Design a protein with these regions (language model features):
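Short non-domain terminal segments
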Residues: 2, 6-8, 77, 247, ...
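N-terminal type II signal-anchor transmembrane helix
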Residues: 2-30
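N-terminal start-of-chain detector that recognizes signal peptides
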Residues: 3-7, 50-51, 74-76, 118-119, ...
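Intrinsically disordered, low-complexity segments enriched in polar/charged residues with Gly/Pro
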Residues: 8, 18-21, 63-66, 89, ...
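Signal peptide-directed extracytoplasmic domains
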Residues: 15, 25-172
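Bacterial extracytoplasmic/cell-wall-associated proteins, especially those involved in peptidoglycan
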Residues: 114-125, 132-306
Length: 306
């Protein structure tokens, strides 16, 4: 037993010595991706190419001695050049991968999401939008905080976001939508309009009810948010000419809902459509760009604007 302990201590000393054998003077952090299914030798080669270790054999031998060799995990890591072999092995063994935090705000369009991700060097905007447009996923990229590893593909990002939408959109929502005679796409489309129109949380259900009342009566929705989407106008004041733009998204010209969502709504806006306020209001307008004034009759609506 004493001999075994001595050998074990000796091996630990060797590991410590070798783990500090190659320490760069640079304190630089380096992002390195270990491909899925890589062997210990292949991992060592990647680390050597990035000048994080000085010798492949030393790395492989230490990984065998420590028992880490069969448990090293793939992924994207953030290594410091002065980490040393043992610390790198521990990170690979624990799977301490590096990821970027990305918060997608409620109401962002797919294009805005693509721009945000491109700024963080996580995707190519054009590739991202091609996938979104091909599968008509505007509205289904759920706004939330995500952690993405560098090197992730555009499709993987989209899959994560649409999967989150699937988790948030409960089965009971489908039953409620049927009661309102709405399809899922109708719900998401209307929720996206509510998301853009609402300035404060308390008004979401009131705004949703106005639009539902208008749909029921066969009126134009007359949502300025749909005009902005059609014109790709995010902030400039709209003109009367803008309200006449020929677009399937123009709810001043076309009856019913637009062809699809105009942004990616959050859960509160989706719930507002499915569980709207109890009201007969048919009109609303924003007062000083803040809260809204609601009315049942047109005359009352005009009077409040004076």
């Amino acid at each position: 037993m004493k001999i075994f302990n001595l050998i074990f201590i000796f091996l630990l000393v060797v590991i410590v010595i070798y783990s500090g054998y190659y320490l760069s003077r640079s304190n630089e952090n380096l992002i390195v991706t270990i491909p899925y299914g890589s062997t210990t030798k292949e991992i060592a080669k990647v680390l050597l190419e990035n000048k994080l270790i000085s010798n492949e054999s030393i790395f492989v031998n230490i990984s065998k001695i420590t028992g880490f060799s069969k448990k090293l995990q793939s992924g994207t890591y953030k290594f410091n050049r002065r980490s040393g072999t043992l610390k790198i092995l521990l990170m690979l063994w624990k799977g301490k991968t590096f990821s970027l935090k990305v918060t997608v705000p409620e109401g962002y369009t797919a294009e805005q999401i693509a721009e945000l991700l491109q700024e963080k060097k996580l995707c190519d905007k054009e590739k991202f939008m091609k996938l979104v447009d091909k599968n008509r996923l505007e509205g289904y990229l759920f706004p939330d905080t995500y952690f993405f590893s560098p090197g992730i593909s555009e499709q993987e990002i989209i899959d994560r976001m649409t999967a989150e939408f699937g988790r948030q959109y409960l089965s009971e929502f489908n039953n409620k939508a049927k009661e309102l005679r709405l399809t899922k796409n109708d719900v998401v489309s209307l929720a996206s309009i509510v998301e853009k129109e609402a300035k404060i949380e308390e008004e979401r259900k009131l705004i949703a009810r106005v639009f539902l009342n208008r749909l029921k009566k066969g009126w134009h929705l007359e949502s300025c948010a749909t005009i902005r989407y059609a014109l790709k106008n995010s902030g400039k004041p709209l003109t009367y000419k803008d309200l006449k733009v020929k677009s399937p998204y123009n709810t001043y010209r076309n009856y019913g809902l637009p062809p699809g969502p105009i942004c990616n709504p959050g859960l509160l806006s989706i719930k507002a459509v499915l569980y709207p306020a109890d009201s007969d209001n048919m009109f609303f307008f924003t007062k000083n760009g803040g809260t809204h004034q609601f009315s049942k009759y047109y005359d009352e609506h005009i009077k409040k604007q004076r």
